[in-house]
Amino acid sequence: KSKYEIQKLISEIAHQLRTPLANIKNYTELLQESLNETQETLNTEYIKDLRTSEEQLCFLVESFIKTARLEQGIIQVHTQKENLVETILNALGQIQKKAEEKEIFFQVELPEKIICEHDKNWMCEAFYNVFDNAVKYSKNNSRINITMKQTEMFYKIQVRDYGIGIRDGEENKIFQRFYRGEQARGQEGCGIGLYLSREIVLLQKGMMKAKQMKPGLLIEVNLPV
């Protein structure tokens, strides 16, 4: 009961933050529209920083809400036969802007079509978090590899970056809620993205695992054939 109450509290707090965050977003947009020509350069930099902070906070709040609701069973996955490749590419499209800002290139090797039983909305969320994690901890002007292979039991989607990676023994820990790897200290993030992704995958009878690379990290998402 205590765990449930804590989850409910987190969900409620996160939900209450939505309104002030929406106000910040709206006022930032209004401020940007009313820029004075003589102050345009300076104001643009301030607004850019403000919008970046607002986007990070929004992402954090939404992640808390989704995690709490999933754990409480308020939101459930609804699987049906969908094109898994399309789901992956949708998530990739959402992260493209962040990748471009760091001049990160995605090297994608996927088949044109794989029909797989999954919840396309939640799996898009799961893949987005994996891609976001890879971009976040990759160096500027680097690449991220995305590949897929099929075994007798699973579709294996691998996402390999060449970033800061993890230390020995952290392969399972990085999927724990709020866990931050030793290498990730000092970087933005709250340790909830990969946890949420794994929960989504587990609800669809799949599994996730991580492998230390030199350099970087490999995340593998397995979904049943």
Show which residues each predicted segment covers.
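Short alpha-helical segment of the dimerization/phosphotransfer core of two-component systems
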Residues: 52-57
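Conserved micro-motifs of the catalytic ATP-binding
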Residues: 72-77, 115-118
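Conserved catalytic submotifs in the C-terminal HATPase_c
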Residues: 78-81, 100, 105-114
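Short helix-loop "hinge" at the ATP-lid/N-box region of the Bergerat-fold HATPase_c
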Residues: 134-135
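Short beta-strand/loop element within the Bergerat-fold HATPase_c
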Residues: 141-153
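Short conserved segment of the HATPase_c
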Residues: 166-179
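Conserved glycine-rich
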Residues: 205-210
